[in-house]
Amino acid sequence: MTWNPDQYHQFKDARSAPARDLQALIPERPYAQVVDLGCGTGEQTAQLAQRFPQATVLGLDSSAAMLAKAGAQQLPNLRFEQGDIQELSGSFDLLYSNAALQWLPDHPRLLARLWEHLRPGGVLAVQVPANHDHASHRLLTATANEFETELGGFTRFGTAHGASPVLTPAAYAELLDGLGAVDITALSKVYPVVLPGAEGLIEWTKGTALVPYLSRLDGADAARFLDVYRGKLQAEFPGERVYYAFTRVLFVATRPEL
């Protein structure tokens, strides 16, 4: 996927609010090795490095464009690498991921794999969007189905209905309990966002949900895709003001000491 950091940061304040809440849930401990999975442009990674100066903090992301921006974050205990979350190696005292794991399938299996990289006494802290039932996502999947040939049958989650892998807070809590976690917190929170009509929703989704689709289309097909999607949004949201219930799931858990 080809990420555009400037497009993503068009709504920086709104997108940053859940991250602040996630960081507030992280307990104060003498972490030695910290990793930010899907670190993007690195602002939150730098915040972790500043908060835990005794720790070596790694920001991991698959996007070269995002990491190019992250390079502006300069701290002695901070470094960035390009890589795949699913190929993570090493062990860590804090596994942190804000708005990244929703791109990966099969969260029960994913969390079990990540748990293996968490040291005894370590903390897992995750935030994922849970907006897959919102009209903007449903209409995006409907548009993708109309462009099945151009997209080679691709839908974001590999099914005709574009089903999200994101679970409920209760389901994450149960999964973590099954892994032996303690001090589990799992919650859902709505961050209200008001956007300027359907066009505002287009700009919002260009930063995230549209990326895997537009990355697979050439210029002409991408423009047609946007036009079809825009038409669906305008029919659903004909007014000049769209209230968007920006819903997030946050969970934090500790691996017991040996």
UniProtKB/Swiss-Prot annotation:
Keywords linked to the UniProt accession: Cytoplasm, Methyltransferase, S-adenosyl-L-methionine, Transferase
Xref: InterPro entries: Methyltransf_25, SAM-dependent_MTases_sf, Trans-aconitate_MeTrfase, Trans_acon_MeTrfase_C
Any GO BP annotation: methylation
Molecular function (Gene Ontology), one example: trans-aconitate 2-methyltransferase activity
The protein's Enzyme Commission number: 2.1.1.144
GO CC annotation, single: cytoplasm
Principal location: cytoplasm
Alphabetized Gene3D superfamilies for the sequence: S-adenosyl-L-methionine-dependent methyltransferases, Vaccinia Virus protein VP39
Subcellular location: Cytoplasm
SUPFAM superfamilies the record matches: S-adenosyl-L-methionine-dependent methyltransferases
Catalyzed reactions: trans-aconitate + S-adenosyl-L-methionine = (E)-3-(methoxycarbonyl)pent-2-enedioate + S-adenosyl-L-homocysteine
Keyword Transferase: yes
Described function: Catalyzes the S-adenosylmethionine monomethyl esterification of trans-aconitate.
PANTHER family linked: TRANS-ACONITATE 2-METHYLTRANSFERASE (PTHR43861:SF1), TRANS-ACONITATE 2-METHYLTRANSFERASE-RELATED (PTHR43861)
Name of the protein described by the UniProt record: Trans-aconitate 2-methyltransferase
Organism: Deinococcus radiodurans (strain ATCC 13939 / DSM 20539 / JCM 16871 / CCUG 27074 / LMG 4051 / NBRC 15346 / NCIMB 9279 / VKM B-1422 / R1)
